[in-house]
């Protein structure tokens, strides 16, 4: 499917067999996504020695201000395209790794998950690094914006700022992932 033709639909809650790269308005299910990723890796005959998951959740405070809730917006066709780019970058950097990325949009309350990333690899180090790399690249290139609502006002948090093809940005993400 060409992501620029009418764009994909916002997906419902995660169900088994759903795309491993998704934008959804429904609650995220990290365990189900990780299990589906593991099944896909195993079905290809590849060994899976470790699965690492990252769950980003809405925190109660930001820079000393009490957060009431967040609203996420995304340019969905391009966000999914950026997830696919990240998936390709992970495959080049860690050939034995596979990833899944789901990001939520819409209104999220304190403690709700906004993003889940699962990374599977033949060894734990690669799974950790691929997972960390993916979240850093999402922050750099995915057109997803966060609108924070506080007790005393509201603010937009700057979204993606790096050029998708910026090697320096990719290197920063690799360096951060190496510390995972």
Where are these regions (language model features)?
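Short glycine-rich or small-residue beta-strand-to-loop segments that form or flank ligand, phosphate
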Residues: 114-121
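N-terminal, polar/charged subdomain of small-to-medium soluble alpha/beta proteins
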Residues: 14-114, 129-132, 136-180
């Amino acid at each position: 499917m060409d992501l620029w033709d009418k764009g994909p639909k916002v997906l419902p809650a995660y169900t088994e067999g759903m795309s491993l790269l998704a934008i959804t308005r429904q609650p995220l299910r990290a365990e189900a996504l990780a299990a589906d990723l593991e099944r896909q890796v195993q079905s290809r005959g590849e060994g899976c020695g470790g699965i690492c998951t990252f769950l980003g959740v809405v925190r109660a405070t930001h820079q000393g201000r009490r957060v009431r809730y967040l609203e996420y917006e995304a340019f969905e066709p391009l966000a999914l395209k950026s997830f696919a780019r990240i998936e390709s970058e992970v495959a080049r950097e860690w050939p034995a790794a596979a990833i899944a990325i789901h990001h939520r949009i819409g209104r999220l309350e304190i403690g709700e998950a906004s993003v889940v990333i699962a990374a599977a690899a033949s060894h734990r180090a690669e799974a950790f690094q691929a997972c960390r790399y993916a979240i850093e690249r999402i922050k750099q290139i995915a057109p997803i914006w966060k609108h924070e609502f506080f007790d005393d006002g509201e603010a937009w948090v700057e979204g993606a700022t790096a050029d998708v093809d910026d090697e320096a940005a990719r290197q920063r993400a690799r360096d951060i992932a190496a510390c995972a």
